[in-house]
Amino acid sequence: MVREEVVGSTRALQWKCVESRADSKRLYYGRFILSPLLKGQADTIGIAMRRALLGEIEGTCITRAKSEKVPHEYSTIAGIEESVHEILMNLKEIVLRSNLYGTRDASICVRGPRCVTAQDIISPPSVEVVDTTQHIASLTEPIDLCIGLQIQRDRGYRMKTTKNSQDGSYPIDAVSMPVRNANHSIHSYGNGNQKQEILFLEIWTNGSLTPKEALHEASRNLIDLFIPFLHAEEEDINFEENQNRFTVPPFTFPDRLANLKKNKKEIALKCIFIDQSELPPRTYNCLKRSNIHTLLDLLSNSQEDLMKIEYFRIEDVKQILDTLQKHFAIDLPKNKF
């Protein structure tokens, strides 16, 4: 456990982690502070951050299981202690860590008698089981158990369909919520008009990411939501003849880049996220898996660096070069200086 003393301050706005601990492989806790804030700001930030932590962060989970000769979800299999439904519920609880996008296949193939745990899941290299001791099933006889699994990255909670598949495939309630809980509290200090606030933010995660990582991703998601308003005063708003109605021109990547040509400040580059670009989904996913999130991140790499990214092709590099040349008249260097 790590603890630091919290002291009120009138210095520039800053944040720090004042407590961090791992209660188990599937329960991490972190406590953070942000200060000094003006009266009312702490509650504004705290509410928005809590919503982003609980609803905007993506997670990876098992969404479907398939096994032959299973008539329905509530049936039992000779030689297995648990029912099919209980096995599906155990698979639902498996915590995975991954940066994958799209759907991946995994499997379990074991022979009893033995206890089947998360360690027996055969998954792609990009997927990691957080707690390999998580129980799945108990085989009481020398039988073979083979289960095909489908793994997907998403966010929030998705209810399974009630209809069973004809091929022995059963959907699982997808709980893609790495943050178990998040709370915020406010400490006020000072007198009269000099009153200021300290925001305390508590985060519990399931082990697939740390509270600090969750805070970083939630902050990035919030920034991404507000980007269209950053230069709203520079956009031309087209008012219709009816004064009670108006149409705002859609936010597009080329429009933003046109503004950046006039103002190539580093902070502006940090405000352009690659998910707002015109890059194909495949290229975008490869970049994000390599922690390239903003235009500034992208411009910090050479063509040689991009080619080292897993699953990246020369066509992807050309697409990026074309986009940068078209909107910025900038070329990425072939090699690092």
UniProtKB/Swiss-Prot annotation:
UniProt subcellular location: Plastid, Chloroplast
Listed GO CC annotations: chloroplast; DNA-directed RNA polymerase complex; mitochondrion
Catalyzed chemical reaction(s): RNA(n) + a ribonucleoside 5'-triphosphate = RNA(n+1) + diphosphate
BP GO terms, sorted: DNA-templated transcription
Region (Alpha C-terminal domain (alpha-CTD)): 265-337
E.C. numbers: 2.7.7.6
Keyword set includes Ribosomal protein: no
Region described as Alpha N-terminal domain (alpha-NTD): spans on this chain: 1-233
The protein's enzyme class: transferase
Gene3D superfamilies: 5' to 3' exonuclease, C-terminal subdomain, DNA-directed RNA polymerase, insert domain, RNA polymerase, RBP11-like subunit
Function in brief: DNA-dependent RNA polymerase catalyzes the transcription of DNA into RNA using the four ribonucleoside triphosphates as substrates.
Similarity-based family: Belongs to the RNA polymerase alpha chain family.
Name by which UniProt lists this protein: DNA-directed RNA polymerase subunit alpha
The organism of origin for this protein: Acorus calamus (Sweet flag)
High-level lineage: Eukaryota, Viridiplantae, Streptophyta, Embryophyta, Tracheophyta
